[in-house]
Amino acid sequence: MQKIRRDDEIIVIAGKDKGKRGKVLKVLADDRLVVGGINLVKRHTKPNPMSGVQGGIVEKEAPLHASNVAIFNGATNKADRVGFKVEDGKKIRVFKSTQKAVDA
């Protein structure tokens, strides 16, 4: 079970976007995350009239490592760590500071 999943709200704790919050769009296999509006890079694209792609400079999200982000706890309004607990025979994710379920 992953500590950070798609659609979780996270806060960046290290790097050029430190302090920014965003929603996880994609979780990649090598402990990297794509987060909406964070770690934006510019890519130069060639126009392709066959597929209708207009050329130019495109800004898009680049993946960042999971160690540079923390899950955001809305109850405490701070970054938090994730732990696991077994409740009713199911393994659930909980915030370490409040012991409340992440998906609640």
Swiss-Prot record:
One of its GO terms (cellular component) is ribonucleoprotein complex. Gene3D superfamilies: 2.30.30.30. CDD domains: KOW_RPL26 (cd06089). Keywords: Ribonucleoprotein, Ribosomal protein, RNA-binding, rRNA-binding. It comes from the Bacteria. GO terms for molecular function: rRNA binding; structural constituent of ribosome. GO terms for biological process: translation. It holds the Pfam family KOW. Belongs to the universal ribosomal protein uL24 family. NCBIfam families: rplX_bact. HAMAP family: Ribosomal_uL24_B. Part of the 50S ribosomal subunit. One of two assembly initiator proteins, it binds directly to the 5'-end of the 23S rRNA, where it nucleates assembly of the 50S subunit. This is Large ribosomal subunit protein uL24. The gene is rplX.
